[in-house]
């Protein structure tokens, strides 16, 4: 199980422009919130909490076997 700080570090290595995240039951989604859009043109990634594995957002959200449960509201970092 990774911590939020570890997840932020992994995400920033992939794209240092990430400035917001949304927590889900089993993952964190990181993205660019530029005030107009919440993805900054499609730049988003998901990091699984259990494994620390970095996924493209499509792989996480399009997985019909996965139960997507949002935790709280989006947060800027």
Show the residue positions of the predicted features.
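Long, contiguous N-terminal structural blocks used for assembly/anchoring
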Residues: 1, 76-77
């Amino acid at each position: 199980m990774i911590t939020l700080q570890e997840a932020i570090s992994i995400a920033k290595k992939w794209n240092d422009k990430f400035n917001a995240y949304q927590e889900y039951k089993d993952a964190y989604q990181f993205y660019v919130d530029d005030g107009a859009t919440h993805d900054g043109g499609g730049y988003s990634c998901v990091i699984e909490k259990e494994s620390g594995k970095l996924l493209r957002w499509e792989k996480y959200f399009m997985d019909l076997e996965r139960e997507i449960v949002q935790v709280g509201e989006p947060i800027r970092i």
